[in-house]
Amino acid sequence: MADLFQEIDDELRQDKASRLWRVYGKYVVAAAIVIIISVGGYKFWQQKQLDDGEKASIAYEAALARSASGDHKGAIDQLNEEEIGTVAGYAALSQMQKANLAMKINDFEAALLTFKEIAEHDNYPQSVKEWASFRYVAVRVEKQIDSKASADLDSLIATDSPWRFLAKEIKAIKEIETGNKSAAKTIFSELADDENAPERLRVRVAEFLKILQ
């Protein structure tokens, strides 16, 4: 196409515009239209992204305000609005908030369903999916919702997820609740000695160990 335009330019300078236009005119017009549509389409898409992002931001903030006022159910309904769910970043945020709000109103079934959806979503950031996987397991263990939860907790502990340390702490606490203090002490000791574990968690489990002495 570049050679075509160069040839047209040279021929025009030689006063052969009329003949060339009859030959190449339709291609020049077509190329110009493609360029205009491409640039205009990108600009339109870019502006739409900005507009959609602004709408999502307003709707998301409004949902948080409703939650802060105590209307958690209304906040969940607002987070389900289309203008939030169609914007990638806000879609993930709204799902996370919906799960947390469902927990606040004791709708554990809805919370678990949302945690699972987040964890299995192809387009969400890995860190968000790992958080959701942890919450999906932790809630089931804490609320004793199903018998498979403990096995899933052990599986999570065996991974390289950054949440494995909290999962291990939960396991130790459940051991205490079932009267198995020896197993709890072993787990807490492992966490306290693990240099990869978060410092605050290591301090916390050290306090648990003092209590269990």
List the model feature ranges, each with a label.
Residues D15-R19, V23, G85, A158, ...:
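Membrane-helix interfacial "entry" motifs
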Residues G89-Q213:
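Soluble extracytoplasmic domains of inner/organellar membrane proteins
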Residues M1-V34:
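N-terminal positive-inside, membrane-proximal cytosolic segments immediately preceding the first
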